[in-house]
UniProtKB/Swiss-Prot annotation:
Metal-binding listed as a keyword: yes
Membrane-crossing residue ranges in chain numbering: none
Active site per database record: 55
GO biological process terms held by the UniProt record: guanine catabolic process; purine nucleoside catabolic process
Key words of the record: Hydrolase, Metal-binding, Purine metabolism, Zinc
Name of this chain's protein: Guanine deaminase
Native source species: Bacillus subtilis (strain 168)
Length: 156
């Protein structure tokens, strides 16, 4: 498998997205058995969706194509090292590998600096820039109990 070919496609998608004005400079492709099954471009600004990063967009499309919520035996190629949000999505999707071209420091130099998010993760919830507050309810564990008791659940 020629990883460079798929990475070049991801970079091309990123450039096309910029030139079309659909979002930030990021592109991604997902490959299974040597063939591209899904492509994604960042379209945050045109969709008004802050989660519409190239990797997430590609993952959503690939899962629809496969009719599955995990990307077993797939490889994700992305134009840039994934941000923390995309990293989480990638781990949930479980591809067998990820290849990227540019580093997150390259993205930071272009105005896409996500280093603050990594710093926020290590802080106690109440000390984050956007404070998080837990409010316990008597029924706060009931969704998890319902999940444990649900006979037809698909574990993931």
């Amino acid at each position: 498998m020629n990883h460079e070919t798929f990475l070049k496609r991801a970079v091309t998608l990123a450039c096309e997205g910029v030139n079309a004005g659909i979002g930030g400079p990021f592109g991604a492709v997902i490959v299974k058995d040597g063939a591209i099954i899904a492509e994604g471009q960042n379209n945050v600004t045109t969709s008004n969706d802050p989660t519409a990063h190239a990797e997430v967009t590609a993952i959503r499309k690939a899962c629809k194509v496969l009719g599955a919520y995990q990307l077993d035996d797939c490889i994700l190629y992305t134009s840039c090292e994934p941000c923390p949000m995309c990293l989480g999505a990638i781990y949930w999707a479980r591809p067998k590998a990820v290849f990227y071209a540019a580093e997150h420091t390259d993205a930071a130099e272009a105005g896409f600096d996500d280093s603050f998010i990594y710093k926020e993760i290590d802080k106690p919830a109440e000390e984050r820039t956007i404070p998080f507050y837990q409010v316990t309810l008597t029924e706060h564990l009931s969704p998890f109990q319902a999940w444990r008791n649900f006979a037809n659940k698909k574990e993931y």
